[in-house]
Structure formats: structure tokens, C-alpha cells
């Protein structure tokens, strides 16, 4: 009802109309100012999302790396990436266990562990041959702080326990980069044993399309 009264007043009096103009201008300025401030004052999460967008990706060069061998060199400098995180994944035999377990190697914590694993106790590995394991695996080896991989009796030190977000009963090993390379096996022994890992590269780029184009040119494979 008050809206109709205001309209009638404005129509009856030109002076009333003129008085409303400054108020309308002030309201417009306040609205624009509020919009600008709201667009600038982003939370940390919003800022990260705004900066990275969909520019995170994964590259599969198609390399298999033998245990005891270093990972192949790839032309990452030409890809213009801000950050890379090499990642290796395979199945390994643990002394005392009847079945193979999942082995993953990368810099930790990193983009490959975020949202997938949570540190329950201890710490993340800081050097090669240090690992974290899931509770199920730790229970399977009797709660020990050492784990032995076969063949070669490769001793690994357990420095922490992690929970897997998607499969809490899984038996998994998460190792620091360089652990696979330090396995005391020759290439011949690794080939005979069939010990090879799938090599992947996580990356962060401000130009994901350009990066993926260069990846395809250099490796003949697309980003995942």
C-alpha cells in the first residue's frame, strides 16, 4: 500500500520527485560499492578456485619403470606448468602376506593424496624408504614399524598411518618419491620378477589447454 502512496505523492509534487533523485543515486552507488567489495573479498578457498579453475590435470606418459630404476626424463619445462608431482603406482609383495598390496609413490602430502587419504597417526614420509600404510595393512603385519618388500628383502620404515577415504579396508602403501628407485635390484632381476610401476604426472597449469597440446606433441598422449 505504501508503494501506491509514494507513487501518488511523486506524481502530485515535482519537488518530491526531485528530492527522490539524490536518494536513488545514493542507493545506486551503495549497491555498486557493495558488489565490488563482495567480488574482491574472496575466501581463501574461493581465491584458489578462481586462480586454478580447471587447470589441474594428469598426464600418462605411457612409461613403465622397473624397480631399482630411475623414472624417465620428460620435457616438463616446455609444458609451462606451475607445479608437477610425479606419481608411480603398482602392486607389490609384502613379506608375510599372501596377497599383493597397492603401492603408490609421490611427494606427500600432495594433490594425489588430497581428499583420498587422511593422516591418522605419525607423519608423512620425508625421505626415500619412508612410508605410510593403511590400518588394515599395519594390522596384517602385526603392528610393526618395518615392512619388507620381496624380492630383495627391501626394508621400508613405517612413519605413519593413513585412512583411505573410499576403501577403508584396503591394504595400501604410500611411499616418498625415490623409494622405488632405491629398491636393491638390478634391471635384470626386476624384469624377471615383473616388478614395474606405471608412471604418471600430476600437474598444475594456468593454461591447461596449451599444456595438454604440448604434452600430446611431446609424448603422443592426451591429458587425463
Regions found by a protein language model. Name each.
Residues 3-224:
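Membrane transport/envelope proteins' first extracytoplasmic loop
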